[in-house]
Amino acid sequence: MIRAQIDAVLSDIQIDAIKIGMLATPAVIDAVADSLAGFRGPIVLDPVMVAKSGDALLQDDAVACLIERLLPRASLLTPNIPEAERLLSGKSDLIPQEQGKALLGLGPAAVLMKGGHADGAVCHDYLVSESQIVGFDAPRIDTGNTHGTGCSLSSAITAGLAKNMALDEAIGTAHQWLHGAIKAADKLDIGQGHGPVHHFHQFWR
């Protein structure tokens, strides 16, 4: 069913870039990987596998399948620190730039190490490739409404790549947009608990 849905879209619409989020099982990962075998555009892989609580969302067999089937296809891998540690078999003694370099060895063309889980008044993200390391910094915002920050960032980067932006430009533009979305998040009043960022902050004043 999943492969049929992807095949239907790819055969009907020109797809300029693809973002992959959480894939729960090896069967789902295999279906996505098989469907994208002929796709030659940029692929952004957000390896969602650790909940904000620290609980694992993917079993070990799914993580292994993700590493084997999809990391080598990724134009950009966007892990946070706990996800990077999981992909690197629990290595926690590396700084983010070193984690990014180690993850390049698993196949992605570039890695964006997200620093939102770290401490400090400034969030530091690092774009790591074979040729360079580029930093993207933003002041940490005191809000409880940060649900979906990583997914939103990877989606915004993918949108930039679909518009033929260079990778560092797509990341910088997405970073600016997400900072505004977090800053405006407290204007929303949606449900109980951990609220979402304000995706439409540029339009809803």
Predicted regions and their residues:
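Conserved phosphate/ATP/ADP-binding segment of small-molecule kinases
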Residues: 60-133
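Short, small-residue alpha-helix embedded
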Residues: 85-86, 144-167
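Nucleotide and nucleotide-moiety/phosphate-recognizing core
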Residues: 27-39, 109, 132-133, 167-169
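Conserved N-terminal subdomain of the carbohydrate kinase-like
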Residues: 1-52, 57, 200-203
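Short pre-catalytic strand/loop immediately N-terminal to key active-site residues, enriched for Gly-Thr
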Residues: 133-147
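Phosphate-handling active-site elements
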Residues: 133-134, 160-174
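Charged C-terminal helix
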Residues: 169-205
